[in-house]
């Protein structure tokens, strides 16, 4: 019997927290579907979503200022359990009649939480026990405000040395507040606390499992497309691979795979992709030579957003042309949830576009093909779990992500054939050395970036002006936040030496040591 994987659902309202997407991932790990929406979303959307519980995220602002963000007032009147985290707790307390003040001593980092009332959220959870027999928890704090007076109906359920009201609860209305962050790994029992809220308080049934997601996706694809054919664009990445595999599992030979050789793929990538997909999918793969087409469309374009949109439009036009030849009506795409989040804007304009993904905001409005996006609700780690469950090879599943527009957005400014050739060689050297040194799977994504600037160097006995290559490697779980990878200096020196000596046009190599945020993973 097929499960309704969306029947039980949690809504997360985002107040601008760097951890908001992490909350969503934790809820998904518990086995319950959730969605992340901006805190200023309209009432109708929330009511249509019909959540079993609502989580208010943290945020960078202070509740004590009149113009700061507030939770929609009606959510406290609909009988739905609410959990406020950090800023979410503070705004809930303030909006329901409590008081919030700036603290004399901000709390950042580890703190020991003393549980005063373990009912519901903290039931059976402890890291240690105090001499008085009270449960103690190691938690992660990051706040400059505190709830100084509880709202009517609430009681303090936990405290720290610096926060007398570190957790609060109105058990009758099922409203809970946590001043700490249960979603981060620095709060070891955080997963269990969130599970208590989602499973026991909100009474959600954990149907969001890999097996059920696959079943639901197959059923959805079959219902949408019927007997019609679907065309799926292959890129060599995990997203398009899992998309193609799901579609093939759903409709068999109705799937047609298309690999567009844009000229912007990595060195030897076309041959590698064709080999992998024909071997493991057994599907028909059409390779379209579109190098001249993409280069012509990108000529003179230096703006990153324009490059992304042009790439998106050219991809769609190629697929439409192939679809007409084959009488195909559907396009399958590997859009994933972070693509949707990063490309979204709130209706009030408070959200900001970080970048447009070529398969989300970069699609032309007059597109003739109908879209099917089976991964649209999934984070990257969920996509990889699906791929393994579907039997795809681990080397493909854990291959580093590659952007749809390809090397066009790893070349700063205008794209031309010379720059592409230089970047392909530099990137291949970097990846080759990562694999030889067993660092490839220790980082989540690594690549080279071409900078169209010339820097002076010395080759032989002569001065030499050459281009600059930047190397980027990051570690991340969900690609929503990332840390730069602290690779050994000896390794970076070896890569730099090879690039400068093997690519005559390059005179300098630099390494990017910026986290996300403030930077994005890609340079453009």
From Swiss-Prot:
SUPFAM superfamilies: Adenine nucleotide alpha hydrolases-like, Class I glutamine amidotransferase-like, GMP synthetase C-terminal dimerisation domain. The keyword ATP-binding applies. Residues 9-207 form the Glutamine amidotransferase type-1 domain. CDD domains: GATase1_GMP_Synthase, GMP_synthase_C. It is an enzyme of class 6 (ligase). Its EC number is 6.3.5.2. One of its GO terms (molecular function) is ATP binding. Catalyzes the synthesis of GMP from XMP. This is GMP synthase [glutamine-hydrolyzing]. It comes from Coxiella burnetii (strain CbuK_Q154).
